[in-house]
Amino acid sequence: LGETYTNINLNKPQNKPLNKQVYEGIENCNLCKRHQNSKPVIGLFNPNSKLTFITLTPMLDSQLNFLNNLKAAMLESIIQKVFNCPLKDCSILSLLKCDSNSLNLEEEINACLFHLIWQLDNSASKVIVVFGEILPKRLLNLSKEESFGRIVSLKTKHFLSTHALEDMLKNPTLKKEALAHFKIALQFLNQS
């Protein structure tokens, strides 16, 4: 008589490991409009690597192969020839997880930043090499002048900032500066 029955048997949330939740969060991300034109790329994340490289946009495809462009080829060369590091022994990440022409860079950075911070928080890397001016500003709250070419420590992480790959391609004299920056990172790695 006027009563209704409601089935309150709720589905319990799946207790997935945190890293699986984050990976699925990145893979299924739709926090900004970039995902409409590109599939999110987690990057090569090795939590035990001693060295991490971070670019603004992905340099790897979803199969973890380097993209077929000059920036990705330059990064691969830096990792293998300058740092003499096998790809399996490093992490290659990006701030933005989708590669497309920017629609609203600030909004996209805000949407993706927590994914990258989680990856860094769960990384054992001794040195994190960041490319370009946007990353040190967003991760460390430091300008180019304050961060480029020096080891900057934040919590237990050590960052080295250098020129963006695209800037080095446009202005080859920046490659010499970047090489000097990389030598600082190598010295730091060898000391620790």
Kindly label every feature range from the protein language model.
Residues 1-192:
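A polyanion-binding, active-site-adjacent surface
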